[in-house]
């Protein structure tokens, strides 16, 4: 009976840890963001410059030739 109570308490503690870790980590991230300022955390994605949203006519022609 004691073992079952200990297992139940440990399970409840683990579930609380998992459910509250998201809020805890978000608080840490927000605090670090305030320390660094708004400019420090902007544009962290380094791959935005690699994507070109416009496809030129030459690109379309190349793709059509490639698919033949």
Curated annotation (Swiss-Prot):
What's in the keyword line of the UniProt record? Answer: Amidation, Antibiotic, Antimicrobial, Cleavage on pair of basic residues, Cytolysis, Fungicide, Membrane, Secreted, Signal, Target cell membrane, Target membrane
Return the similarity comment: Belongs to the non-disulfide-bridged peptide (NDBP) superfamily. Short antimicrobial peptide (group 4) family.
Which tissues does it occur in? Expressed by the venom gland.
Give the originating organism: Mesomexovis punctatus (Scorpion)
Transcription regulation among the record's keywords? no
Q: Which residues form the propeptide?
A: 37-68
UniProt superkingdom: Eukaryota
GO annotation (BP), single: killing of cells of another organism
Its protein name is Antimicrobial peptide VpCT3
Cellular component, GO, one term = extracellular region
Q: Give residues where Leucine amide occurs.
A: 36
Q: What does this protein do?
A: Antimicrobial peptide with weak activity against all bacteria tested (MIC>100 uM) and all yeasts tested (MIC>200 uM). Also provokes weak hemolysis on human erythrocytes (HC(50)=83.7 uM).
The subcellular localization recorded is: Secreted; Target cell membrane
Signal peptide location in the record?
1-23
């Amino acid at each position: 009976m004691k073992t079952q109570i200990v297992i139940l308490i440990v399970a409840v503690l683990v579930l609380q840890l998992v459910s509250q870790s998201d809020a805890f980590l978000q608080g840490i991230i927000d605090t670090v963001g305030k320390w660094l300022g708004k400019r420090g955390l902007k544009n962290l994605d380094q791959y935005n410059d690699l994507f070109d949203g416009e496809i030129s006519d030459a690109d379309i022609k190349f793709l059509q030739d490639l698919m033949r």
